[in-house]
């Protein structure tokens, strides 16, 4: 960089100027190299000197900055005008300069990005650091400690601050900048970090928070936390709620129509059963639905793994379905509104109503169409005209009976589908037939005894699977004779254009 000379405006700038400060550039040994005026604008840091133009450092390119008594220093990045380097300046108002720069950083929400560095102990003595000036490429690169634990930077004119393409990252010996915690308003407290459902440690973290607003259905005393919990209210009577929490908003949705139908069905089934099974359900803990290590051990008979199933589950296709919906009526009742008992970190996007599917049926032959069984009504209000495994419906806790895979296409022509149907029916092939022509060439090319083509009276099968012997055969010799006759015709019919290149061609 070279040494800095005295600034021409040194005497004209008052000592108490708001954003201009008189500074003296120093090296790492504290030797004064030159004086100047440091100005802080809204976007950049400017140093005015006498024998050169002003030097500017944009705030976004500053890696760190700090001060110690009467010394202000900062580190610039590669994108600055001076390139990568560390600069130190003596200033009687170093603290004011630092506070003003920090305030500008906060007002503009500028976050100084720190790279992963090697931590250095704060009790490092000056004897451990060589006193000679050095560049960042020197293996013994270190930083002289200041009373506040942050390193003293090389001078403005030191070789270490000179931009060079050979310079490695100075961050290899970097420490967090002065006032870093207060400088970065974008840092979020740990309690405000978004935690998603099915994350390990969510339940334990929420148990340790006393200030978290617990929803009414999950509000239990400490004495009752170790005892089996019961459902606070009937899920059918629960209304949608919006709960405000310090970490976000939770939407508690009511049961879907499909869940209401299943709950009514379970109530009717439980009326005819022994009430002992209902009392035994109170001795089991509720499944929170979290796929974490904190899930408590519950007998597999009374525990149900709840999932939002995409597509209907078929008992006959157990190897394809994803949800395990094989449990007793007691566990179904416990988990029928399982999502309402969950305690997610933020928004609860569950129990969404199912969407109508888009059918894409394949064409069936007449034999398959006639062998299909009676039509089965759908559980979600739509026609089961297709294979249920190809219906991408967001259906929750719905089990399709084994007869649901039987499809009736014969009745489908008479009813109007309630959803989009891209099945374009082709006309029936009952009255269509294709007659092939057979030409017998055993007689050779004898023109005196022409062969009469034979037309078969019996139609061929609709879908031939192998080659047949009845194909149209081309007479090669007759075709060649017709071709030669065509070539013998005059080529000039009066429409072709005559040029000097083809005017000598005479008609044949």
From Swiss-Prot:
Phosphorylated on tyrosine residues upon stimulation by FGF2 or NGFB. Phosphorylated by ULK2 (in vitro). Phosphorylated on tyrosine residues by activated ALK and FGFR1. Phosphorylated on tyrosine residues upon activation of FGFR2 and FGFR3. Phosphorylated on threonine residues by MAP kinases; this inhibits tyrosine phosphorylation, and thereby down-regulates FRS2-mediated activation of MAP kinases. It comes from the Eukaryota. Changing residue 196 to F: Abolishes tyrosine phosphorylation and interactions with GRB2 and PTPN11. It is found in: Membrane. Ubiquitous. Expression is highest in brain, kidney, lung and testis. PANTHER family: DOCKING PROTEIN RELATED (PTHR21258), FIBROBLAST GROWTH FACTOR RECEPTOR SUBSTRATE 2 (PTHR21258:SF40). Part of a complex containing FRS2, GRB2, GAB1, PIK3R1 and SOS1. Part of a complex containing GRB2 and CBL. Binds ALK, CKS2, FGFR1, RET, MAPK1/ERK2, MAPK3/ERK1 and SRC. The tyrosine-phosphorylated protein binds the SH2 domains of GRB2 and PTPN11. Interacts with NTRK1, NTRK2 and NTRK3 (phosphorylated upon ligand-binding). Identified in a complex containing FGFR4, NCAM1, CDH2, PLCG1, FRS2, SRC, SHC1, GAP43 and CTTN. Adapter protein that links activated FGR and NGF receptors to downstream signaling pathways. Plays an important role in the activation of MAP kinases and in the phosphorylation of PIK3R1, the regulatory subunit of phosphatidylinositol 3-kinase, in response to ligand-mediated activation of FGFR1. Modulates signaling via SHC1 by competing for a common binding site on NTRK1. GO terms for molecular function: fibroblast growth factor receptor binding; neurotrophin TRKA receptor binding; transmembrane receptor protein tyrosine kinase adaptor activity. Residues 117-131, 227-240 have a biased composition (Basic and acidic residues). Residues 116-180, 201-243, 268-298, 315-345, 441-467, 483-508 are annotated as: Disordered. Residues 325-341 have a biased composition (Polar residues). One of its GO terms (cellular component) is adherens junction. This is Fibroblast growth factor receptor substrate 2. Signal peptide: none annotated. GO terms for biological process: anterior/posterior axis specification, embryo; cell surface receptor protein tyrosine kinase signaling pathway; fibroblast growth factor receptor signaling pathway; forebrain development; gastrulation with mouth forming second; lens development in camera-type eye; lens fiber cell development; lens placode formation involved in camera-type eye formation. Residues 13-115 form the IRS-type PTB domain. Keywords: Lipoprotein, Membrane, Myristate, Phosphoprotein, Ubl conjugation. The lineage of its organism: Eukaryota, Metazoa, Chordata, Craniata, Vertebrata. InterPro entries: Docking_Protein_DOK (IPR050996), FRS2_PTB (IPR038742), IRS_PTB (IPR002404), PH-like_dom_sf (IPR011993). The modification Phosphoserine is found at residues 177, 211, 221, 365. The modification Phosphotyrosine is found at residues 196, 306, 349, 392, 436, 471. A lipid is attached at residue 2 (N-myristoyl glycine). CDD domains: PTB_FRS2 (cd01202). It is a lipid-anchor.
């Amino acid at each position: 960089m070279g040494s800095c000379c005295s600034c021409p405006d040194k005497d004209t700038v008052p000592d108490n100027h708001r954003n201009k400060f008189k500074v003296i550039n120093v090296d790492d040994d504290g030797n004064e190299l030159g004086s100047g005026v440091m100005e802080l604008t809204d976007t950049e840091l400017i140093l005015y000197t006498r024998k050169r133009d002003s030097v500017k450092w944009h705030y976004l390119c500053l890696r760190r900055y700090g001060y110690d008594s009467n010394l202000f220093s900062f580190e610039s990045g590669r994108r600055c005008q001076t390139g990568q380097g560390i600069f130190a300046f003596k200033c009687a108002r170093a603290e004011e300069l630092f506070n003003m720069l920090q305030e500008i950083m906060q007002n503009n929400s500028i976050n100084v990005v720190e790279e992963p560095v090697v931590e250095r102990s704060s009790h490092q003595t000056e004897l451990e650091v060589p006193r000679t000036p050095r560049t960042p490429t020197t293996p013994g690169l270190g930083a002289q400690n200041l009373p506040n634990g942050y390193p003293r930077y090389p001078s403005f004119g030191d070789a270490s601050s000179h931009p060079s393409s050979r310079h490695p990252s100075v961050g290899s010996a970097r420490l967090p900048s002065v006032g870093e915690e207060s400088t970065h308003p974008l840092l979020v407290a740990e309690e405000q970090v978004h935690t998603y459902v099915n994350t390990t440690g969510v339940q334990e973290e929420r148990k340790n928070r006393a200030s978290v607003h617990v929803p009414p259905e999950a509000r239990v005393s400490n004495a009752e936390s170790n005892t089996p919990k019961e459902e606070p209210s009937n899920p059918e009577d629960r209304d949608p709620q919006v709960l405000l929490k310090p970490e976000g908003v939770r939407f508690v949705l009511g049961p879907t129509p499909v869940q209401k139908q299943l709950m009514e069905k379970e109530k009717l089934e439980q009326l005819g059963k022994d009430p002992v099974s209902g009392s035994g359900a109170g001795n089991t803990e509720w499944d929170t639905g979290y796929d974490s290590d904190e899930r408590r051990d519950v007998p597999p008979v009374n525990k149900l793994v709840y999932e939002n199933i995409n597509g209907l589950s078929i008992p006959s296709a157990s190897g394809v379905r994803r949800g395990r919906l094989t449990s007793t009526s007691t566990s179904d009742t416990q988990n029928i509104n399982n999502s309402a008992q969950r305690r997610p970190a933020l928004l609860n996007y569950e129990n969404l109503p199912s969407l109508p599917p888009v059918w894409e049926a394949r064409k069936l032959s007449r034999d398959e169409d006639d062998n299909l069984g009676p039509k089965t009504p759908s559980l979600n209000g739509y026609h089961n005209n297709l294979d249920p495994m190809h219906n991408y419906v967001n259906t929750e806790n719905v089990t399709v009976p084994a007869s649901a895979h039987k499809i009736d296409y014969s009745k489908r022509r008479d009813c109007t589908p309630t959803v989009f149907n891209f099945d374009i029916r082709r006309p029936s092939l009952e009255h269509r037939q294709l007659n092939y022509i057979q030409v017998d060439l055993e007689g050779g090319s004898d023109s005196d005894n022409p062969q009469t083509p034979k037309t078969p009276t019996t139609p061929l099968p609709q879908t031939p699977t192998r080659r047949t012997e009845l194909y149209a055969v081309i007479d090669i010799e007759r075709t060649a004779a017709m071709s030669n006759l065509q070539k013998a015709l005059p080529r000039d019919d009066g429409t072709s254009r005559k040029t000097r290149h083809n005017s000598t061609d005479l008609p044949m």
